[in-house]
């Protein structure tokens, strides 16, 4: 497996700490609002990484956290009058529903900041007692001047930092960042009541759930490119100082999602929520669209491109529909190798999808000439099952896929007409059966009689 290491800024061979085991930590969302397409892009990108490693035979341990106490959440509490738990539980539930729609599997462990407080406090205590942190009026801060490797992760220069760090007169240095914010409304600690700073959460969670036994805590730390500085830089600094080891052997970052070629963000007011996109296409089509460009590339969201991407996926589902009732056999070894080789090259999705498109085109051509070639059909079913597990698509029933967007009242009317047609056929009233089929055709509904009954789709 070849991956791109954000720190070395080059592709490298993935050599895990323990052979054929991959320990991965991905920074999850701060849960104060609905998830946007940036969250979707990141989640899909590293879901593809996880699936690829599993397909290569790796045992993968995958952790994604939830930041469930933060300034933005406190602001939401003030605006709504709701409790911290009500807000965060609500948005965690919404986030998980969005991920389910995108076929992004739950992480193996999903720690929250509020359930990791003991570890976070112990970890900050280690930094404070060993001189890596200091206390001022509003909290405990990490002293970046004590870490001679600070900025080695992001490669930034001091003069380029001011726009991305919080300024405070009492800090020893602009780069210093808060580990614990004093606040009488929250949690007890040896330093005083308060709550953890954002940058102090992930290292404690990684230490809790991985406990690396060598110079690295984990194999891969991943997240959006906007997290490289300051978040990941600050995490790496804390781990070096607290435990005298590197946090991760490899760092991977996905590109930005843009709208009109501007970075999408809530602060710019141009966020596009996942739930809004799911009004336009099925979740799997949104997944297919967002993963269709390389994970490291910036992605410009366009509604027309989204709809075109669904049509590309429609074609694969139409092949799946031609294989109804066919059992699996062995996957085409060359197809499996070629598509897995592409994904093993730093998740080269463009090549992988080109291979998939070619397989679909060739399959349709051969089925047109050999519609009863069962051995070939069985290989195709196996190919599509492999694609399902590797790329996270083709989970939906092939007819239900083409029923998306049809409202419930029309579905009910179609069901009644199909029942009437089946009864007419049973009574050998084939003229009436044909009339009902014609009526459905005029409604842009195509029907197909299968061993499992009469199926329909929206044309």
Curated annotation (Swiss-Prot):
<dbReference type="InterPro" id="IPR024909">
    <property type="entry name" value="Cys-tRNA/MSH_ligase"/>
</dbReference>
<feature type="binding site">
    <location>
        <position position="266"/>
    </location>
    <ligand>
        <name>ATP</name>
    </ligand>
</feature>
<keyword id="KW-0436">Ligase</keyword>
<keyword id="KW-0547">Nucleotide-binding</keyword>
<dbReference type="GO" id="GO:0008270">
    <property type="term" value="F:zinc ion binding"/>
</dbReference>
<feature type="short sequence motif" description="'HIGH' region">
    <location>
        <begin position="29"/>
        <end position="39"/>
    </location>
</feature>
<protein>
    <recommendedName>
        <fullName>Cysteine--tRNA ligase</fullName>
        <ecNumber>6.1.1.16</ecNumber>
    </recommendedName>
</protein>
<dbReference type="InterPro" id="IPR032678">
    <property type="entry name" value="tRNA-synt_1_cat_dom"/>
</dbReference>
<feature type="short sequence motif" description="'KMSKS' region">
    <location>
        <begin position="263"/>
        <end position="267"/>
    </location>
</feature>
<comment type="subunit">
    <text>Monomer.</text>
</comment>
<keyword id="KW-0648">Protein biosynthesis</keyword>
<dbReference type="Pfam" id="PF01406">
    <property type="entry name" value="tRNA-synt_1e"/>
</dbReference>
<keyword id="KW-0067">ATP-binding</keyword>
<dbReference type="Pfam" id="PF09190">
    <property type="entry name" value="DALR_2"/>
</dbReference>
<dbReference type="GO" id="GO:0006423">
    <property type="term" value="P:cysteinyl-tRNA aminoacylation"/>
</dbReference>
<feature type="binding site">
    <location>
        <position position="202"/>
    </location>
    <ligand>
        <name>Zn(2+)</name>
    </ligand>
</feature>
<dbReference type="InterPro" id="IPR015803">
    <property type="entry name" value="Cys-tRNA-ligase"/>
</dbReference>
<dbReference type="GO" id="GO:0005829">
    <property type="term" value="C:cytosol"/>
</dbReference>
<dbReference type="GO" id="GO:0004817">
    <property type="term" value="F:cysteine-tRNA ligase activity"/>
</dbReference>
<comment type="similarity">
    <text>Belongs to the class-I aminoacyl-tRNA synthetase family.</text>
</comment>
<dbReference type="InterPro" id="IPR015273">
    <property type="entry name" value="Cys-tRNA-synt_Ia_DALR"/>
</dbReference>
<feature type="binding site">
    <location>
        <position position="27"/>
    </location>
    <ligand>
        <name>Zn(2+)</name>
    </ligand>
</feature>
<keyword id="KW-0030">Aminoacyl-tRNA synthetase</keyword>
<feature type="binding site">
    <location>
        <position position="235"/>
    </location>
    <ligand>
        <name>Zn(2+)</name>
    </ligand>
</feature>
<dbReference type="InterPro" id="IPR009080">
    <property type="entry name" value="tRNAsynth_Ia_anticodon-bd"/>
</dbReference>
<feature type="binding site">
    <location>
        <position position="231"/>
    </location>
    <ligand>
        <name>Zn(2+)</name>
    </ligand>
</feature>
<dbReference type="InterPro" id="IPR014729">
    <property type="entry name" value="Rossmann-like_a/b/a_fold"/>
</dbReference>
<keyword id="KW-0479">Metal-binding</keyword>
<keyword id="KW-0862">Zinc</keyword>
<dbReference type="GO" id="GO:0005524">
    <property type="term" value="F:ATP binding"/>
</dbReference>
<keyword id="KW-0963">Cytoplasm</keyword>
């Amino acid at each position: 497996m070849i991956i791109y290491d954000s720190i070395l800024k080059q592709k490298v061979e993935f050599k895990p700490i323990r052979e054929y085991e991959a320990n991965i930590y991905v920074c999850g969302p701060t849960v104060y609002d609905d998830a946007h397409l940036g969250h979707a892009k990141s989640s899909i990108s590293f879901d593809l990484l996880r699936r690829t490693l599993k397909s290569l035979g790796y045992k993968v341990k995958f952790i994604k956290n939830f930041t469930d106490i933060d300034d933005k959440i406190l602001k939401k509490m003030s605006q709504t009058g709701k409790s911290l738990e009500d807000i965060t539980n609500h948005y965690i539930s919404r986030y998980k529903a969005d991920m389910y729609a995108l076929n992004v599997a739950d992480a193996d462990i999903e720690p929250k900041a509020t359930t990791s407080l003991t570890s976070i406090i112990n970890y900050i205590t280690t930094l404070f007692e060993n001189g890596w942190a200091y206390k001022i009026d509003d909290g405990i801060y990490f002293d970046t001047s004590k870490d001679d490797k600070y900025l080695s992760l992001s490669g930034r220069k001091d003069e380029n930092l001011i726009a991305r760090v919080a300024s405070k007169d009492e800090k020893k240095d602009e780069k210093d960042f808060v580990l614990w914010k004093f606040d009488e409304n929250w949690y007890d600690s040896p330093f005083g009541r308060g709550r953890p700073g954002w940058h102090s959460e992930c290292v404690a969670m990684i230490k809790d759930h991985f406990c690396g036994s060598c110079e690295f805590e984990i194999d891969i730390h991943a997240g959006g490119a906007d997290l490289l500085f300051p978040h990941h830089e600050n995490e790496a600094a804390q781990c070096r100082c607290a435990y005298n080891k590197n946090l991760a052997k490899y760092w991977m970052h996905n590109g930005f999602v843009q709208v009109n070629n501007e970075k999408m963000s809530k602060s710019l007011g141009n966020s596009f929520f996942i739930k809004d996109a799911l009004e336009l296409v099925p979740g799997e089509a949104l997944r297919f669209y967002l993963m269709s460009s390389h994970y490291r590339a910036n992605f410009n969201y366009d509604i027309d491109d989204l709809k075109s991407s669904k049509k590309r996926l429609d074609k694969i589902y139409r092949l799946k529909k031609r294989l109804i009732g066919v059992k699996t056999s062995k996957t085409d070894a060359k197809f499996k190798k070629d598509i897995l080789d592409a994904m093993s090259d730093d998740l080269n999705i463009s090549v992988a999808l080109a291979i998939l498109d070619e397989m679909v085109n060739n399959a349709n051509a051969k089925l047109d000439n050999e519609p009863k070639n069962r051995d070939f059909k069985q290989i195709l079913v196996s190919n599509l099952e492999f694609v399902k597990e590797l790329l996270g698509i083709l989970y939906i029933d092939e007819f239900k896929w083409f029923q998306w967007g049809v409202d419930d009242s029309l579905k009910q009317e179609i069901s009644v007409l199909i029942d009437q047609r089946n009864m007419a056929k049973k009574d050998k009233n084939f003229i009436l059966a044909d009339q009902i089929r014609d009526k459905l055709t005029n409604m842009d509904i195509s029907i197909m009689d299968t061993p499992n009954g009469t199926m329909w789709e929206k044309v």
